[in-house]
A protein has these predicted regions:
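Conserved AMP-binding/adenylation subdomain of ANL enzymes
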Residues: 211-228, 236-277, 285, 291
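Structural core segment of the AMP-binding/adenylate-forming
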Residues: 74, 102-170
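Conserved pre-ATP/AMP-binding loop-to-beta segment of ANL
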Residues: 22, 37-40, 160, 173-192, ...
Length: 463
């Protein structure tokens, strides 16, 4: 790949139809089952906090069809929104595919939500249904739900992952309800952003955008059919429910999600299941390295690591590579881009694999200053995104806007640089930009010397 503009921080590429997955989630899981019915799609093993399962693609395809019919049979209609609330339970993924087949919308809910957060999240999208884990944080979820459901007028259908879904599966298997036609451009998933600049924003994402971003990231990482990939991303997050879940189905690989991250348990999974890839946050790798059993482990099957969620220093990436004896790559993405938008090439040197990397196929990027002008190479500015993974917009902004600029570019809010080859490095948030004498200054660039000198505390004064 060659950067179209060698001087300006701009990567503009045409969208090739071959880079877009114009299918629905239901079509994705069904096609995987048709091609490889007996390959394991989802495995939970060596995790004492959750039941052990080994679901094939055929099982997941058939069960999601039954559950979709069960949901429609109890009164939900295509277009209704259903919340999913809980940790990384296997039934979460089954529910995700079932909701997609039923033409329902899915709003993912953080298991750390308390009463007011849950009320806000469900009322904002006028949720008709809620599917939840039996216990969340060691507390029966039904206790909280019973206290708040009266404050959510639209909510009429509530089921737990265990007993509730089992009955819906039985009902659906006996039903002759015809599943609706679903379009790949229909909005399917709604996720709330962190809300660091105000109230949480409801990002709306289509089937097509979700699958396209997930598949293209896995192609870049060279994930293969039947490859075992363990990951530590929460399913309520875009990294878990989209990138890892839909990427695995796209490549027909085996997904091994962590129910709750525990370093020793994660090492058990990687070792006993012979996982060849682990994807998670830098803190996951650090915790595993510090586990007392780490040096005794046989991790010879593990060949590659992908980290996301932060921008680790090159030195730390090298430590990961040496400790696990595996290739390590960083990646950059966000909810609004349906997951990954940049990651390095497998052939890149370590210093390039430590930064955000190159745009995925079909993704265009710009780095602009406070006047919306494209900056020169290696100058910091706000990163703008345009591409097939872009959300349809926020669904709850007070002014009714989508959050996407009129020219189709989405302002990520992230501060970045782009080099002459198109590689992106995230250096902060745009609100941290300091403008001095017309020059954009990043706080990371200003504070970097203190890190190199191991200075713990410093005060910076700019004149």
């Amino acid at each position: 790949m060659t950067k179209p503009n060698k001087e300006l921080s701009e990567w503009i590429v045409p969208i090739d139809e071959s880079d877009i997955s114009s299918i629905t989630l239901g079509e994705l899981i069904d096609s995987a089952a048709d091609e490889f019915p007996d390959i394991e799609a989802l495995v939970y093993s060596n995790q004492p906090d959750v039941k052990e399962i080994r679901w094939t693609y055929k099982f997941l395809s058939d069960a999601s069809t039954d559950l979709a019919r069960g949901l429609l049979g109890e009164g939900l209609s295509p277009g209704d929104t259903v919340g999913v609330w809980g940790p990384n339970h296997p039934e979460w993924i089954l529910t995700e595919y079932a909701l997609a087949k039923a033409g329902l919308k899915m709003v993912t809910l953080n298991p750390l939500y308390k009463d007011q957060e849950l009320i806000f999240a469900l009322n904002t999208v006028k949720a008709k249904g809620l599917i939840h884990a039996d216990n969340i944080g060691g507390i029966p979820a039904s206790d909280l739900i019973n206290t708040i459901k009266g404050e959510i007028p639209s909510l009429h259908h509530i089921h737990s992952f265990d007993k509730g879904l089992n009955q819906l599966l039985v009902n659906g298997a006996q039903s002759s309800i015809q599943l609706p036609a679903v379009n790949s451009k229909d909005i399917f998933m709604i996720q709330y952003t962190s809300g660091t600049t105000g109230m949480p924003k409801a990002a709306q994402m289509t089937h097509e955008a979700l699958i396209t971003s997930a598949k293209n990231s896995h192609i870049r990482w060279k994930v293969t059919n039947n490859q075992k990939v363990c990951h530590g991303f929460p399913l309520f997050h875009i990294g878990g429910s989209a990138c890892m879940t839909l990427g695995a189905a796209s490549m027909r690989s085996v997904s091994l999600p962590l129910y709750i991250f525990k370093p020793g348990v994660t090492l058990d999974i990687i070792e006993n299941e012979s996982c060849s890839m682990f994807i998670g946050a830098p803190v996951h790798l650090t915790a595993m390295m510090q586990d007392p059993s780490f040096q005794k482990r046989d991790l010879s099957a593990l060949k590659s690591l992908v980290v996301g969620g932060s921008n680790p220093p090159v030195e730390l990436m090298k430590q990961f590579s040496e400790a696990f004896d595996a290739d390590v790559t960083n990646g950059y993405g966000m909810t609004e881009t349906c997951g990954l938008s940049c990651t390095a090439l497998p052939t890149d040197p370590p210093e390039l694999k430590a930064i955000a990397g190159l745009p995925l196929p079909g993704v265009s990027l710009r780095v602009v200053d406070h006047n919306y002008q494209i900056v020169m190479n290696d100058m910091p500015g706000e990163l703008l995104y345009k591409g097939p993974g872009l959300m349809n917009g926020y669904g709850n902004l007070p002014d009714g806007s989508s959050g996407i600029n009129d020219d189709g570019w989405f302002p990520t809010g992230d501060l970045a640089t782009m080099n002459s080859e198109g590689y992106i490095n995230i250096v902060g948030r745009s609100k941290e930009m300091i403008i001095r004498g017309g020059e954009n200054l990043s706080l990371i660039h200003i504070s970097e010397p203190t890190r190199l000198l191991s200075i713990s505390y410093a005060v910076f004064c700019l004149k």
